[in-house]
Design a protein with these regions (language model features):
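Non-catalytic, solvent-exposed segments at the cell envelope interface
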Residues: 1-251
Length: 251
């Protein structure tokens, strides 16, 4: 949720938050993949750490907050991945990739812009975001499209998640269209300063071989307001069905 990577050494709880959380579930046998979108406001037990990295306590909070108790880079990603695993009943999260907003701008410009059809009237964010309008987002406009929201509206994050899903599908499609390995590695190198990941360039390139479903699955639940903040209460019964369907196979 920051334009740049956090400065190491910041106080715990001040190293940014996860603005958008998505888990790519891959089937290595069938070479298919499915995106599971997780609301940043999903309530879970957040681990609180001191400046030396010692765990102090656990308290109820939005999953986006867990990132803030790391270092803004690898540690933040590891902590967040752990909470995603916890949310999904212990399913292993093997890899992570975090991209700053500056990186989003760079990625969008690198692929020549992203074309979307605006699903609702978002002219309050930008005059060009009229309902039904088909527009090509450049870097700065792309940031507005996936980041901006009216925090006074309780459901604004869910609305933003819809735009993020739409944008992500279009970006993945563009990146999968890159056939030249040299061009792909060049894109990876250009994004390196904005990105934190434990994946190699070669591993990321391999994802181009997977057919990614256009239907993004969302963690089910309902949004409520409490103490002036949005809270997304996960429907654990329905989530368990999704986890069983995505990660397990009947024998």
């Amino acid at each position: 949720d920051k334009d740049e990577k956090a400065d190491l050494g910041n106080n715990p709880g001040e190293n940014g938050q996860s603005d958008s959380l998505n888990l790519l579930v891959i089937n290595k046998v069938e070479k298919t993949a499915q995106i599971l979108q997780i609301s940043r406001d999903s309530m879970i037990d957040i681990d609180i750490y001191d400046v030396t990295g010692n765990k102090l306590m656990t308290e109820d909070g939005q999953i986006a907050l867990q990132y803030a108790y790391g270092d803004g880079e690898e540690r933040s990603c590891q902590l967040t991945a752990g909470k995603v695993s916890e949310l999904l009943y212990g399913v292993d999260v093997d890899s992570y990739l975090s991209l700053t907003l500056d990186g989003l701008v760079a990625a969008t410009d690198a692929v020549g812009g992203i074309t979307v059809t605006v699903p609702e009237d978002y002219t309050a964010i930008d005059p060009s975001f009229e309902k039904g309008a088909t527009i090509t987002l450049n870097g700065d406009l792309a940031e507005k499209y996936v980041r901006k929201r009216d925090i006074e509206v309780l459901d604004s994050n869910n609305q933003r998640m819809e735009r993020q899903s739409q944008f992500m599908e279009a970006l993945i499609e563009k990146m999968q269209g890159i056939d030249d390995k040299t061009e792909y590695l060049s894109l990876y190198q250009n994004l390196d300063e904005y990105m934190t990941t434990n994946l190699t360039a070669e591993e990321l390139e391999e994802l181009a071989d997977y057919k990614i479903s256009e239907d993004i699955v969302k963690v089910p639940g309902e949004i409520i307001s409490k103490d002036g903040h949005a809270q997304y209460l996960v429907d654990n019964k329905e989530l368990k069905k999704i986890v069983l369907n995505l990660f397990y196979k009947l024998l």
